[in-house]
Amino acid sequence: VTYVAASPRSAGKAYKDAVSSRWLIGANIPEGVADLVVEDANDPSKALGKCKFVFSALEMGKDEIKALEKAYAQEGIPVVSNASANRWTEDVPMLIPEINFAHLDVIAEQKKHNGFENGFVAVKPNCSLQTYMMPLHALIQAGYPVKRMIVTTLQATSGAGYPGVPSFDMIDNIVPFIGGEEEKTEKECLKILGSVVDGKIQNAEYPIVSSTCTRVPVIDGHTACVSLEFDLPEDKKPSLEEIEKIWTSYTSVPQELNLPSAPKQPIVVRHEENRP
């Protein structure tokens, strides 16, 4: 980390001072970051020469986020965004790299369309999808197309940010509704599984997804219970043994490139009864 930026309220402060009342992680602030001076995020030119790309975790209106992420890209700075604002922009890839690395091809069209020279915007999907999209893709890639999918998520309280869900709602309870989460679940997987056509991402038609998203009293880690209906005759469907073999042998381009943050084994199958 070589550059940090936030609202004008924090600009000019050392990072350790800007977050002193909000640092909630058990570990200390990393030494290399603690003394970085926080810049005003509204001035992308301040990032020039200080970083190769930026992570965006903005808490603003969607139109404001789109405008600011675009401004960084126009300055020649690639943007990797945690925000949902650009997830449905046709020429912005929504990446789980093991699955849809080919969607990076739309960046050339994005640059052309917006006049970006070196910058671009890429986004990550909704956090709960990341738990089950790779096992789903592994089966599809192995020749077992999926027609329908029923998903029930049990999502950790930390996913709601801080201070998060009120304690009276969470203690001894499961919250059965997370606003907008089911819609994201049912739509985003189709973009991730889609294909690039004429410089834009064309959504997949299948699987048809029905989802229920709940908040559970767990600090970290989302769980998903997924039921699949294969688009195959009964005698062509994979056995449990075949499914496990497909999952445990699954690798993709990030593993082939030996990228430093890519897991060596993307899918780990656990057999214990007390494990997901």
Task: List where the protein language model places each region.
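Short, well-ordered beta-strand elements within core beta-sheets of diverse protein domains
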Residues: 56, 224-232
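N-terminal Rossmann-like NAD(P) cofactor-binding subdomain of oxidoreductases
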Residues: 1-170, 174-177, 204, 208, ...
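Oxyanion-binding "anion nests"
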Residues: 180-227
